Swiss-Prot record:
GO terms for biological process: positive regulation of metabolic process. CDD domains: fungal_TF_MHR (cd12148), GAL4 (cd00067). Coiled coil: none annotated. SUPFAM superfamilies: Zn2/Cys6 DNA-binding domain. GO terms for cellular component: nucleus. Keywords: DNA-binding, Metal-binding, Nucleus, Transcription, Transcription regulation, Zinc. GO terms for molecular function: DNA-binding transcription factor activity, RNA polymerase II-specific; transcription cis-regulatory region binding; zinc ion binding. This is Transcription factor himD.
Length: 598
Protein backbone atom coordinates (compact mmCIF):
# COMPACT_ATOMS: atom_id res chain seq x y z
CA UNK A 1 0.00 0.00 0.00
CA UNK A 2 1.11 3.59 -0.66
CA UNK A 3 2.54 6.12 1.78
CA UNK A 4 -0.55 8.29 1.24
CA UNK A 5 -2.76 5.63 2.77
CA UNK A 6 -0.57 5.22 5.81
CA UNK A 7 -0.45 9.02 6.35
CA UNK A 8 -4.27 9.39 6.52
CA UNK A 9 -4.51 6.58 9.03
CA UNK A 10 -1.98 8.23 11.38
CA UNK A 11 -3.29 11.81 10.94
CA UNK A 12 -5.44 12.19 14.09
CA UNK A 13 -5.23 10.94 17.60
CA UNK A 14 -8.13 8.52 17.39
CA UNK A 15 -7.91 4.85 16.89
CA UNK A 16 -7.33 3.82 13.32
CA UNK A 17 -10.57 1.80 12.94
CA UNK A 18 -14.07 3.21 13.27
CA UNK A 19 -16.67 1.40 15.31
CA UNK A 20 -18.61 0.22 12.22
CA UNK A 21 -15.49 -1.31 10.60
CA UNK A 22 -14.40 -2.78 13.91
CA UNK A 23 -17.75 -4.57 14.36
CA UNK A 24 -17.53 -5.85 10.74
CA UNK A 25 -13.89 -6.87 11.35
CA UNK A 26 -12.70 -5.27 8.15
CA UNK A 27 -10.06 -2.75 7.44
CA UNK A 28 -10.92 0.91 7.91
CA UNK A 29 -9.50 3.29 5.31
CA UNK A 30 -9.89 7.06 5.05
CA UNK A 31 -9.01 8.72 1.75
CA UNK A 32 -9.03 12.19 3.34
CA UNK A 33 -7.45 13.19 6.66
CA UNK A 34 -10.80 14.15 8.24
CA UNK A 35 -14.37 12.95 7.93
CA UNK A 36 -15.88 9.52 7.51
CA UNK A 37 -13.96 6.47 6.37
CA UNK A 38 -14.43 5.27 2.86
CA UNK A 39 -16.73 2.38 3.83
CA UNK A 40 -19.05 4.43 6.05
CA UNK A 41 -19.30 7.15 3.43
CA UNK A 42 -20.11 4.59 0.75
CA UNK A 43 -22.78 3.00 2.99
CA UNK A 44 -23.95 6.41 4.25
CA UNK A 45 -23.39 5.48 7.87
CA UNK A 46 -22.29 7.64 10.77
CA UNK A 47 -18.59 7.12 11.18
CA UNK A 48 -17.52 7.25 14.82
CA UNK A 49 -14.07 6.68 16.30
CA UNK A 50 -13.24 5.92 19.88
CA UNK A 51 -10.76 8.36 21.38
CA UNK A 52 -7.19 7.17 21.51
CA UNK A 53 -5.18 6.44 24.60
CA UNK A 54 -2.78 8.84 26.22
CA UNK A 55 0.36 9.63 24.30
CA UNK A 56 2.64 8.38 27.06
CA UNK A 57 0.94 5.04 27.15
CA UNK A 58 2.80 2.11 25.56
CA UNK A 59 1.65 0.68 22.26
CA UNK A 60 -1.33 -1.58 22.52
CA UNK A 61 -1.50 -5.10 21.11
CA UNK A 62 -3.68 -3.92 18.25
CA UNK A 63 -1.23 -1.15 17.38
CA UNK A 64 1.70 -3.62 17.22
CA UNK A 65 -0.36 -5.88 15.04
CA UNK A 66 -1.24 -2.97 12.75
CA UNK A 67 2.41 -2.01 12.39
CA UNK A 68 3.32 -5.55 11.38
CA UNK A 69 0.49 -5.56 8.89
CA UNK A 70 1.76 -2.26 7.47
CA UNK A 71 5.27 -3.67 7.07
CA UNK A 72 3.99 -6.73 5.26
CA UNK A 73 1.82 -4.57 3.01
CA UNK A 74 4.82 -2.39 2.13
CA UNK A 75 6.85 -5.47 1.22
CA UNK A 76 4.00 -6.78 -0.90
CA UNK A 77 3.81 -3.43 -2.69
CA UNK A 78 7.48 -3.64 -3.62
CA UNK A 79 7.16 -7.19 -4.95
CA UNK A 80 4.11 -6.29 -6.99
CA UNK A 81 5.89 -3.26 -8.41
CA UNK A 82 8.88 -5.37 -9.51
CA UNK A 83 6.63 -8.00 -11.09
CA UNK A 84 4.64 -5.35 -12.94
CA UNK A 85 7.75 -3.64 -14.34
CA UNK A 86 9.17 -6.96 -15.54
CA UNK A 87 5.90 -7.84 -17.27
CA UNK A 88 5.75 -4.45 -18.98
CA UNK A 89 9.38 -4.79 -20.14
CA UNK A 90 8.79 -8.25 -21.65
CA UNK A 91 5.63 -7.03 -23.35
CA UNK A 92 7.45 -4.08 -24.92
CA UNK A 93 10.20 -6.37 -26.24
CA UNK A 94 7.64 -8.75 -27.72
CA UNK A 95 5.84 -5.84 -29.38
CA UNK A 96 9.03 -4.60 -31.02
CA UNK A 97 10.32 -7.99 -32.26
CA UNK A 98 7.56 -10.61 -32.29
CA UNK A 99 9.80 -13.24 -34.01
CA UNK A 100 12.61 -13.09 -31.46
CA UNK A 101 13.42 -16.55 -30.03
CA UNK A 102 14.31 -17.06 -26.35
CA UNK A 103 17.91 -16.26 -25.59
CA UNK A 104 20.36 -19.20 -25.44
CA UNK A 105 21.34 -19.98 -21.85
CA UNK A 106 24.91 -19.18 -21.00
CA UNK A 107 27.26 -22.18 -21.09
CA UNK A 108 28.48 -23.47 -17.75
CA UNK A 109 31.79 -22.06 -16.49
CA UNK A 110 34.87 -23.70 -17.99
CA UNK A 111 38.10 -24.70 -16.24
CA UNK A 112 39.34 -21.11 -16.40
CA UNK A 113 36.17 -19.66 -14.87
CA UNK A 114 36.12 -22.27 -12.13
CA UNK A 115 39.73 -21.52 -11.17
CA UNK A 116 41.25 -24.91 -12.05
CA UNK A 117 43.67 -23.16 -14.43
CA UNK A 118 44.64 -19.61 -15.21
CA UNK A 119 44.67 -18.32 -18.76
CA UNK A 120 48.46 -17.96 -18.53
CA UNK A 121 48.84 -21.62 -17.55
CA UNK A 122 46.49 -22.61 -20.36
CA UNK A 123 48.68 -20.69 -22.82
CA UNK A 124 51.75 -22.65 -21.72
CA UNK A 125 49.87 -25.94 -22.06
CA UNK A 126 48.72 -24.98 -25.56
CA UNK A 127 52.31 -24.22 -26.55
CA UNK A 128 53.39 -27.60 -25.15
CA UNK A 129 50.72 -29.30 -27.24
CA UNK A 130 51.87 -27.53 -30.40
CA UNK A 131 55.54 -28.27 -29.75
CA UNK A 132 55.48 -31.74 -28.14
CA UNK A 133 52.19 -33.55 -28.67
CA UNK A 134 50.99 -32.34 -32.06
CA UNK A 135 53.67 -34.23 -34.09
CA UNK A 136 52.15 -37.47 -32.75
CA UNK A 137 48.62 -36.46 -33.78
CA UNK A 138 48.93 -34.72 -37.17
CA UNK A 139 45.16 -34.95 -37.58
CA UNK A 140 44.35 -31.93 -35.37
CA UNK A 141 46.68 -29.06 -36.15
CA UNK A 142 46.59 -25.83 -34.16
CA UNK A 143 48.35 -23.03 -36.07
CA UNK A 144 51.08 -21.07 -34.34
CA UNK A 145 49.19 -17.74 -34.29
CA UNK A 146 46.34 -19.31 -32.30
CA UNK A 147 46.20 -18.25 -28.67
CA UNK A 148 44.56 -19.82 -25.66
CA UNK A 149 42.02 -17.00 -25.54
CA UNK A 150 40.94 -17.39 -29.17
CA UNK A 151 40.82 -21.18 -29.00
CA UNK A 152 38.81 -20.98 -25.79
CA UNK A 153 36.32 -18.68 -27.48
CA UNK A 154 36.05 -20.39 -30.88
CA UNK A 155 36.53 -24.08 -29.99
CA UNK A 156 35.90 -24.53 -26.28
CA UNK A 157 35.75 -28.34 -26.28
CA UNK A 158 38.91 -28.75 -28.35
CA UNK A 159 40.53 -26.27 -25.96
CA UNK A 160 39.52 -28.43 -22.99
CA UNK A 161 40.73 -31.65 -24.65
CA UNK A 162 44.11 -30.12 -25.48
CA UNK A 163 44.59 -28.89 -21.91
CA UNK A 164 43.70 -32.34 -20.58
CA UNK A 165 46.19 -34.10 -22.87
CA UNK A 166 48.98 -31.63 -22.13
CA UNK A 167 48.69 -32.08 -18.34
CA UNK A 168 50.65 -35.36 -18.39
CA UNK A 169 53.00 -33.98 -15.71
CA UNK A 170 50.12 -33.29 -13.29
CA UNK A 171 48.09 -36.48 -13.18
CA UNK A 172 45.60 -35.47 -10.44
CA UNK A 173 44.67 -32.26 -12.25
CA UNK A 174 44.61 -34.12 -15.56
CA UNK A 175 42.08 -36.59 -14.16
CA UNK A 176 40.00 -33.67 -12.84
CA UNK A 177 39.89 -32.12 -16.30
CA UNK A 178 39.01 -35.52 -17.72
CA UNK A 179 35.84 -35.41 -15.63
CA UNK A 180 35.03 -32.05 -17.20
CA UNK A 181 35.52 -33.63 -20.63
CA UNK A 182 33.08 -36.41 -19.72
CA UNK A 183 30.49 -33.91 -18.50
CA UNK A 184 30.77 -31.88 -21.68
CA UNK A 185 30.46 -34.97 -23.87
CA UNK A 186 27.38 -36.06 -21.95
CA UNK A 187 25.79 -32.61 -22.13
CA UNK A 188 26.41 -32.22 -25.87
CA UNK A 189 25.97 -35.79 -27.12
CA UNK A 190 23.27 -37.09 -24.78
CA UNK A 191 21.36 -34.02 -23.63
CA UNK A 192 20.53 -30.84 -25.52
CA UNK A 193 23.95 -29.32 -26.19
CA UNK A 194 25.26 -28.60 -29.68
CA UNK A 195 26.98 -31.36 -31.69
CA UNK A 196 29.62 -29.54 -33.69
CA UNK A 197 32.91 -29.93 -35.51
CA UNK A 198 34.54 -28.59 -32.36
CA UNK A 199 33.19 -31.66 -30.55
CA UNK A 200 34.60 -33.93 -33.29
CA UNK A 201 38.11 -32.48 -33.08
CA UNK A 202 38.03 -32.56 -29.29
CA UNK A 203 37.03 -36.22 -29.30
CA UNK A 204 39.95 -37.02 -31.62
CA UNK A 205 42.46 -35.35 -29.30
CA UNK A 206 40.86 -37.04 -26.29
CA UNK A 207 41.11 -40.45 -27.99
CA UNK A 208 44.67 -39.87 -29.16
CA UNK A 209 46.03 -39.74 -25.60
CA UNK A 210 43.46 -41.92 -23.86
CA UNK A 211 46.23 -43.89 -22.12
CA UNK A 212 46.20 -41.04 -19.59
CA UNK A 213 42.49 -41.53 -18.83
CA UNK A 214 41.19 -43.05 -15.64
CA UNK A 215 40.22 -46.69 -15.86
CA UNK A 216 38.14 -48.24 -17.31
CA UNK A 217 38.97 -46.38 -20.49
CA UNK A 218 36.18 -45.68 -22.97
CA UNK A 219 38.05 -45.73 -26.27
CA UNK A 220 35.42 -47.68 -28.23
CA UNK A 221 32.52 -45.65 -26.83
CA UNK A 222 34.11 -42.29 -27.64
CA UNK A 223 35.11 -43.58 -31.07
CA UNK A 224 31.53 -44.54 -31.91
CA UNK A 225 30.26 -41.15 -30.76
CA UNK A 226 32.75 -39.47 -33.08
CA UNK A 227 31.79 -41.71 -36.00
CA UNK A 228 28.15 -40.78 -35.41
CA UNK A 229 29.07 -37.11 -35.88
CA UNK A 230 30.95 -37.95 -39.09
CA UNK A 231 27.92 -39.85 -40.34
CA UNK A 232 25.39 -37.15 -39.43
CA UNK A 233 27.45 -34.37 -41.03
CA UNK A 234 28.40 -36.62 -43.97
CA UNK A 235 32.07 -35.79 -43.52
CA UNK A 236 33.01 -39.13 -45.07
CA UNK A 237 32.30 -37.78 -48.53
CA UNK A 238 33.39 -34.80 -50.58
CA UNK A 239 31.65 -31.49 -49.76
CA UNK A 240 30.07 -31.27 -53.20
CA UNK A 241 28.46 -34.68 -52.69
CA UNK A 242 26.86 -33.94 -49.34
CA UNK A 243 23.10 -33.67 -49.05
CA UNK A 244 22.79 -33.93 -52.82
CA UNK A 245 19.41 -35.59 -52.42
CA UNK A 246 17.00 -35.20 -49.53
CA UNK A 247 14.00 -37.49 -49.50
CA UNK A 248 12.02 -35.84 -46.70
CA UNK A 249 13.04 -32.17 -46.85
CA UNK A 250 11.60 -29.73 -49.39
CA UNK A 251 14.49 -27.31 -48.92
CA UNK A 252 17.45 -29.58 -49.64
CA UNK A 253 19.83 -26.84 -50.75
CA UNK A 254 20.28 -25.21 -47.34
CA UNK A 255 23.06 -27.44 -46.02
CA UNK A 256 24.98 -27.90 -49.23
CA UNK A 257 27.84 -25.63 -48.14
CA UNK A 258 28.66 -27.39 -44.85
CA UNK A 259 32.44 -27.88 -44.83
CA UNK A 260 35.42 -27.23 -42.60
CA UNK A 261 38.01 -27.56 -45.34
CA UNK A 262 41.34 -29.19 -44.60
CA UNK A 263 40.61 -29.50 -40.90
CA UNK A 264 37.74 -31.90 -41.46
CA UNK A 265 39.77 -34.01 -43.92
CA UNK A 266 42.59 -34.43 -41.41
CA UNK A 267 40.13 -35.35 -38.68
CA UNK A 268 38.33 -38.02 -40.72
CA UNK A 269 41.67 -39.54 -41.77
CA UNK A 270 42.74 -39.57 -38.13
CA UNK A 271 39.66 -41.43 -36.92
CA UNK A 272 40.16 -44.11 -39.56
CA UNK A 273 43.83 -44.50 -38.68
CA UNK A 274 43.25 -44.85 -34.94
CA UNK A 275 40.27 -47.15 -35.38
CA UNK A 276 41.96 -49.48 -37.86
CA UNK A 277 45.46 -49.65 -36.38
CA UNK A 278 44.38 -50.23 -32.78
CA UNK A 279 41.52 -52.64 -33.49
CA UNK A 280 43.78 -54.77 -35.67
CA UNK A 281 46.32 -55.38 -32.92
CA UNK A 282 43.62 -55.89 -30.29
CA UNK A 283 41.78 -58.38 -32.51
CA UNK A 284 38.60 -56.32 -32.72
CA UNK A 285 36.48 -55.33 -35.67
CA UNK A 286 37.32 -51.86 -36.91
CA UNK A 287 34.46 -49.40 -36.47
CA UNK A 288 35.57 -47.27 -39.42
CA UNK A 289 35.99 -49.07 -42.73
CA UNK A 290 38.25 -47.75 -45.45
CA UNK A 291 36.68 -45.56 -48.14
CA UNK A 292 38.41 -44.15 -51.25
CA UNK A 293 37.61 -40.62 -50.06
CA UNK A 294 40.35 -41.02 -47.43
CA UNK A 295 43.11 -41.37 -50.03
CA UNK A 296 41.60 -38.53 -52.05
CA UNK A 297 41.72 -36.29 -48.98
CA UNK A 298 45.34 -37.24 -48.25
CA UNK A 299 46.37 -36.49 -51.82
CA UNK A 300 44.70 -33.09 -51.62
CA UNK A 301 46.40 -32.29 -48.32
CA UNK A 302 49.80 -33.36 -49.67
CA UNK A 303 49.46 -31.39 -52.91
CA UNK A 304 49.33 -28.05 -51.07
CA UNK A 305 50.67 -28.97 -47.66
CA UNK A 306 50.15 -26.45 -44.87
CA UNK A 307 52.28 -28.54 -42.51
CA UNK A 308 55.10 -31.01 -43.09
CA UNK A 309 52.97 -33.78 -41.64
CA UNK A 310 50.40 -33.30 -44.41
CA UNK A 311 52.88 -35.00 -46.75
CA UNK A 312 52.97 -38.13 -44.55
CA UNK A 313 49.23 -38.78 -44.21
CA UNK A 314 48.89 -40.59 -47.54
CA UNK A 315 51.70 -42.98 -46.64
CA UNK A 316 50.12 -43.64 -43.23
CA UNK A 317 46.81 -44.60 -44.84
CA UNK A 318 48.41 -46.71 -47.58
CA UNK A 319 50.46 -48.64 -45.03
CA UNK A 320 47.41 -49.26 -42.88
CA UNK A 321 45.54 -50.54 -45.93
CA UNK A 322 48.40 -52.95 -46.56
CA UNK A 323 48.21 -54.05 -42.95
CA UNK A 324 44.48 -54.71 -43.24
CA UNK A 325 45.11 -57.11 -46.11
CA UNK A 326 47.23 -59.25 -43.79
CA UNK A 327 44.11 -59.99 -41.74
CA UNK A 328 42.93 -62.26 -44.54
CA UNK A 329 45.78 -64.63 -43.71
CA UNK A 330 45.03 -64.72 -40.02
CA UNK A 331 43.41 -67.88 -38.71
CA UNK A 332 41.92 -66.16 -35.67
CA UNK A 333 38.65 -65.48 -37.50
CA UNK A 334 38.03 -69.01 -38.73
CA UNK A 335 38.27 -72.53 -37.41
CA UNK A 336 39.18 -73.95 -40.80
CA UNK A 337 42.77 -75.17 -41.14
CA UNK A 338 45.07 -73.19 -43.39
CA UNK A 339 46.90 -74.80 -46.23
CA UNK A 340 50.66 -74.44 -45.72
CA UNK A 341 51.29 -73.58 -49.36
CA UNK A 342 48.58 -70.91 -49.37
CA UNK A 343 49.93 -69.45 -46.15
CA UNK A 344 53.43 -69.30 -47.54
CA UNK A 345 52.18 -67.61 -50.70
CA UNK A 346 50.27 -65.06 -48.63
CA UNK A 347 53.37 -64.36 -46.56
CA UNK A 348 55.53 -63.81 -49.64
CA UNK A 349 52.92 -61.57 -51.29
CA UNK A 350 52.61 -59.34 -48.23
CA UNK A 351 56.38 -59.32 -47.73
CA UNK A 352 56.85 -58.17 -51.33
CA UNK A 353 54.25 -55.42 -50.86
CA UNK A 354 56.05 -54.16 -47.76
CA UNK A 355 59.38 -54.12 -49.57
CA UNK A 356 57.85 -52.28 -52.53
CA UNK A 357 56.17 -49.78 -50.20
CA UNK A 358 59.47 -49.01 -48.51
CA UNK A 359 61.28 -48.68 -51.85
CA UNK A 360 58.69 -46.20 -53.19
CA UNK A 361 58.54 -44.08 -50.05
CA UNK A 362 59.27 -40.48 -51.15
CA UNK A 363 61.14 -39.65 -47.93
CA UNK A 364 63.25 -41.57 -45.40
CA UNK A 365 61.22 -43.76 -43.08
CA UNK A 366 62.85 -42.14 -40.06
CA UNK A 367 61.41 -38.73 -41.00
CA UNK A 368 58.14 -39.73 -39.37
CA UNK A 369 58.12 -41.49 -36.01
CA UNK A 370 54.49 -42.47 -36.57
CA UNK A 371 55.26 -44.09 -39.92
CA UNK A 372 58.43 -45.80 -38.74
CA UNK A 373 56.73 -47.39 -35.73
CA UNK A 374 53.77 -48.41 -37.84
CA UNK A 375 55.91 -50.01 -40.57
CA UNK A 376 57.83 -52.28 -38.20
CA UNK A 377 54.62 -53.09 -36.32
CA UNK A 378 53.11 -54.28 -39.61
CA UNK A 379 56.17 -56.50 -40.13
CA UNK A 380 55.63 -57.99 -36.68
CA UNK A 381 51.93 -58.41 -37.36
CA UNK A 382 52.75 -60.38 -40.51
CA UNK A 383 55.08 -62.54 -38.43
CA UNK A 384 52.35 -63.08 -35.81
CA UNK A 385 49.80 -64.11 -38.43
CA UNK A 386 52.23 -66.39 -40.24
CA UNK A 387 53.63 -68.25 -37.26
CA UNK A 388 51.04 -68.19 -34.52
CA UNK A 389 47.52 -67.21 -35.55
CA UNK A 390 46.54 -69.98 -37.93
CA UNK A 391 45.32 -73.46 -37.20
CA UNK A 392 47.61 -76.18 -38.54
CA UNK A 393 46.28 -78.47 -41.23
CA UNK A 394 45.61 -82.14 -40.57
CA UNK A 395 48.62 -83.16 -42.63
CA UNK A 396 52.10 -82.61 -41.24
CA UNK A 397 53.42 -79.18 -42.20
CA UNK A 398 56.16 -78.85 -44.73
CA UNK A 399 59.62 -78.64 -43.23
CA UNK A 400 61.45 -78.31 -46.52
CA UNK A 401 60.47 -74.65 -46.87
CA UNK A 402 62.62 -71.90 -45.39
CA UNK A 403 59.78 -69.39 -45.12
CA UNK A 404 59.02 -69.99 -41.38
CA UNK A 405 62.64 -69.16 -40.63
CA UNK A 406 62.35 -66.09 -42.84
CA UNK A 407 59.29 -64.97 -40.90
CA UNK A 408 61.00 -65.55 -37.56
CA UNK A 409 64.07 -63.60 -38.60
CA UNK A 410 61.92 -60.78 -39.94
CA UNK A 411 60.09 -60.58 -36.62
CA UNK A 412 63.25 -60.55 -34.52
CA UNK A 413 64.78 -57.87 -36.75
CA UNK A 414 61.67 -55.67 -36.57
CA UNK A 415 61.45 -56.09 -32.79
CA UNK A 416 65.07 -55.11 -32.33
CA UNK A 417 64.64 -52.05 -34.58
CA UNK A 418 61.62 -50.79 -32.67
CA UNK A 419 63.04 -51.42 -29.21
CA UNK A 420 66.36 -49.82 -30.19
CA UNK A 421 64.40 -46.81 -31.44
CA UNK A 422 62.53 -46.56 -28.16
CA UNK A 423 65.51 -46.72 -25.80
CA UNK A 424 67.50 -44.28 -27.96
CA UNK A 425 64.87 -41.53 -27.73
CA UNK A 426 65.62 -38.42 -25.69
CA UNK A 427 64.53 -38.82 -22.10
CA UNK A 428 60.80 -38.33 -21.52
CA UNK A 429 60.01 -38.16 -25.23
CA UNK A 430 57.57 -41.06 -24.86
CA UNK A 431 55.18 -38.93 -22.80
CA UNK A 432 54.07 -37.50 -26.15
CA UNK A 433 53.33 -40.91 -27.70
CA UNK A 434 49.70 -41.29 -28.66
CA UNK A 435 47.64 -44.26 -27.60
CA UNK A 436 48.32 -46.17 -30.83
CA UNK A 437 52.06 -45.85 -30.21
CA UNK A 438 51.75 -47.42 -26.77
CA UNK A 439 49.58 -50.22 -28.16
CA UNK A 440 52.28 -50.87 -30.76
CA UNK A 441 55.01 -50.94 -28.09
CA UNK A 442 53.01 -53.36 -25.99
CA UNK A 443 52.58 -55.61 -29.02
CA UNK A 444 56.32 -55.41 -29.77
CA UNK A 445 57.28 -56.43 -26.23
CA UNK A 446 54.77 -59.28 -26.25
CA UNK A 447 55.84 -60.71 -29.59
CA UNK A 448 59.57 -60.15 -29.01
CA UNK A 449 59.41 -62.35 -25.89
CA UNK A 450 57.59 -65.08 -27.78
CA UNK A 451 59.94 -64.93 -30.76
CA UNK A 452 63.06 -64.99 -28.60
CA UNK A 453 61.87 -68.06 -26.71
CA UNK A 454 60.93 -69.79 -29.96
CA UNK A 455 64.31 -68.91 -31.50
CA UNK A 456 66.05 -70.69 -28.63
CA UNK A 457 64.74 -74.03 -29.88
CA UNK A 458 67.87 -76.17 -30.43
CA UNK A 459 66.73 -77.22 -33.90
CA UNK A 460 66.52 -73.64 -35.21
CA UNK A 461 68.86 -71.76 -32.90
CA UNK A 462 71.81 -72.02 -35.34
CA UNK A 463 69.78 -69.93 -37.80
CA UNK A 464 68.81 -67.37 -35.12
CA UNK A 465 71.92 -67.06 -32.97
CA UNK A 466 73.11 -63.82 -34.60
CA UNK A 467 69.73 -62.11 -34.21
CA UNK A 468 69.01 -63.24 -30.66
CA UNK A 469 72.51 -62.18 -29.63
CA UNK A 470 72.02 -58.75 -31.23
CA UNK A 471 68.57 -58.37 -29.68
CA UNK A 472 69.73 -59.43 -26.17
CA UNK A 473 66.14 -59.23 -25.04
CA UNK A 474 66.78 -59.52 -21.30
CA UNK A 475 69.06 -56.48 -21.33
CA UNK A 476 66.70 -54.66 -23.68
CA UNK A 477 63.77 -55.17 -21.33
CA UNK A 478 65.85 -53.93 -18.39
CA UNK A 479 66.65 -50.73 -20.25
CA UNK A 480 63.00 -50.24 -21.15
CA UNK A 481 62.06 -50.68 -17.49
CA UNK A 482 64.59 -48.02 -16.47
CA UNK A 483 63.07 -45.56 -18.95
CA UNK A 484 59.57 -46.20 -17.66
CA UNK A 485 60.69 -45.90 -14.03
CA UNK A 486 61.94 -42.38 -14.77
CA UNK A 487 58.34 -41.42 -15.60
CA UNK A 488 56.63 -43.00 -12.58
CA UNK A 489 55.48 -40.56 -9.89
CA UNK A 490 53.98 -40.97 -6.43
CA UNK A 491 50.88 -38.98 -7.41
CA UNK A 492 47.40 -40.42 -6.99
CA UNK A 493 44.08 -39.29 -8.35
CA UNK A 494 40.91 -38.77 -6.32
CA UNK A 495 40.14 -42.50 -6.46
CA UNK A 496 43.61 -43.53 -5.29
CA UNK A 497 44.82 -44.77 -8.68
CA UNK A 498 48.43 -44.29 -9.80
CA UNK A 499 49.67 -42.84 -13.08
CA UNK A 500 49.78 -44.91 -16.26
CA UNK A 501 53.56 -45.38 -16.19
CA UNK A 502 53.32 -47.11 -12.82
CA UNK A 503 51.17 -49.76 -14.48
CA UNK A 504 53.46 -49.95 -17.54
CA UNK A 505 56.44 -50.64 -15.27
CA UNK A 506 54.62 -53.51 -13.58
CA UNK A 507 53.78 -55.11 -16.91
CA UNK A 508 57.30 -54.78 -18.27
CA UNK A 509 58.67 -56.47 -15.17
CA UNK A 510 56.20 -59.30 -15.55
CA UNK A 511 57.17 -59.65 -19.21
CA UNK A 512 60.83 -59.83 -18.23
CA UNK A 513 60.03 -62.48 -15.63
CA UNK A 514 58.02 -64.48 -18.19
CA UNK A 515 60.84 -64.41 -20.72
CA UNK A 516 63.70 -65.13 -18.33
CA UNK A 517 61.90 -67.97 -16.56
CA UNK A 518 61.30 -69.71 -19.89
CA UNK A 519 64.80 -69.01 -21.11
CA UNK A 520 66.21 -70.55 -17.94
CA UNK A 521 63.94 -73.56 -18.32
CA UNK A 522 65.07 -73.96 -21.93
CA UNK A 523 68.74 -73.75 -20.93
CA UNK A 524 68.32 -76.44 -18.29
CA UNK A 525 66.54 -78.64 -20.79
CA UNK A 526 69.32 -78.20 -23.36
CA UNK A 527 71.96 -79.22 -20.80
CA UNK A 528 70.07 -82.44 -20.21
CA UNK A 529 69.48 -83.24 -23.89
CA UNK A 530 72.13 -83.71 -26.60
CA UNK A 531 71.93 -81.29 -29.49
CA UNK A 532 71.07 -82.85 -32.87
CA UNK A 533 74.16 -83.30 -35.02
CA UNK A 534 73.86 -83.39 -38.77
CA UNK A 535 75.36 -86.64 -39.98
CA UNK A 536 74.93 -89.51 -42.30
CA UNK A 537 71.91 -90.77 -40.43
CA UNK A 538 70.10 -87.49 -40.98
CA UNK A 539 71.01 -87.27 -44.62
CA UNK A 540 69.65 -90.72 -45.23
CA UNK A 541 66.17 -89.92 -43.93
CA UNK A 542 63.53 -89.18 -46.60
CA UNK A 543 62.65 -85.77 -45.13
CA UNK A 544 66.27 -84.60 -45.00
CA UNK A 545 66.81 -85.96 -48.47
CA UNK A 546 64.10 -83.55 -49.67
CA UNK A 547 65.80 -80.71 -47.80
CA UNK A 548 69.10 -81.51 -49.48
CA UNK A 549 67.41 -81.11 -52.86
CA UNK A 550 66.68 -77.39 -52.28
CA UNK A 551 68.61 -75.48 -54.96
CA UNK A 552 71.74 -73.75 -53.76
CA UNK A 553 70.69 -70.41 -55.28
CA UNK A 554 67.47 -70.41 -53.23
CA UNK A 555 69.54 -71.05 -50.12
CA UNK A 556 71.72 -68.11 -51.08
CA UNK A 557 68.71 -65.85 -51.60
CA UNK A 558 67.29 -66.42 -48.15
CA UNK A 559 70.72 -66.36 -46.50
CA UNK A 560 70.39 -69.65 -44.65
CA UNK A 561 69.54 -73.26 -45.33
CA UNK A 562 66.23 -74.90 -44.60
CA UNK A 563 65.98 -76.30 -41.12
CA UNK A 564 65.62 -79.95 -40.27
CA UNK A 565 62.03 -80.86 -39.58
CA UNK A 566 62.59 -83.70 -37.14
CA UNK A 567 62.14 -81.54 -34.09
CA UNK A 568 60.78 -78.34 -35.56
CA UNK A 569 57.18 -77.41 -36.16
CA UNK A 570 57.09 -73.73 -37.01
CA UNK A 571 53.67 -73.30 -35.44
CA UNK A 572 55.03 -74.13 -31.95
CA UNK A 573 51.66 -75.52 -30.83
CA UNK A 574 52.89 -76.25 -27.32
CA UNK A 575 54.09 -72.70 -26.71
CA UNK A 576 51.64 -70.40 -28.50
CA UNK A 577 49.29 -68.85 -27.85
CA UNK A 578 49.98 -68.37 -24.17
CA UNK A 579 46.84 -67.06 -22.40
CA UNK A 580 48.76 -66.25 -19.22
CA UNK A 581 51.12 -63.93 -21.01
CA UNK A 582 48.37 -62.37 -23.10
CA UNK A 583 46.42 -61.56 -19.93
CA UNK A 584 49.59 -60.07 -18.49
CA UNK A 585 49.65 -57.38 -21.14
CA UNK A 586 45.91 -57.20 -21.64
CA UNK A 587 45.36 -53.94 -19.79
CA UNK A 588 48.25 -52.23 -21.57
CA UNK A 589 46.60 -52.75 -24.91
CA UNK A 590 42.92 -53.20 -24.00
CA UNK A 591 40.52 -50.33 -24.58
CA UNK A 592 37.15 -49.95 -22.97
CA UNK A 593 37.13 -53.17 -20.98
CA UNK A 594 37.41 -53.16 -17.25
CA UNK A 595 37.94 -56.88 -17.08
CA UNK A 596 41.68 -56.54 -17.49
CA UNK A 597 42.17 -53.78 -14.95
CA UNK A 598 44.37 -54.48 -11.97
Amino acid sequence: MSDRTRTTRYANGSLRTCQNCARAKIRCIRSVPTGSCDRCERLRKTCQFQPGRRANAGPSLSESKDRRIDALEAKLDRLLAQSTSATVSEASIDDKSPTTTPTTPRPPPDVIDSGLLTLEAASLLLQDYQRTLMPYCPFVMVPSPATAATLRRDKPFLFLAILTAALYDNMPLQRTLELEVKRTIGRCMIFDGPVSFDMLQGLLVHLAWCQYHSRPRRFSQYLHLAISIITDLQLDRAPEDRFWRTRVDFNGELDREISWGREERRAVVGFFWFSSSISQILQKRSSFSFIPYLETSCELLASTAEYDSDQHLLQLIQLQRLSERIIVASGQHTSEPHDADALEQCYRDRRSELDLYLAQLPFPLTDSHLLMMQYHTVELYLCQVTLFDHKPSAQRPRHDSPFPIEALRMGLTAARTLLDFYISLPLRREVAFNNAGWVQLGFVVTLACKLAVAAADPHIHPHMADLTRALDLSTMLSRCILRIQALVTSQMDARGDRDVFYHYEKRLKRAQWWFESRSLSRSQQQRNEPLPVAGAGEASSPRNARIAEIPAEEEFQVGYAAVSGDGFDFQWPGLFPDPTFDDMFGDWMAQGSSGFDD
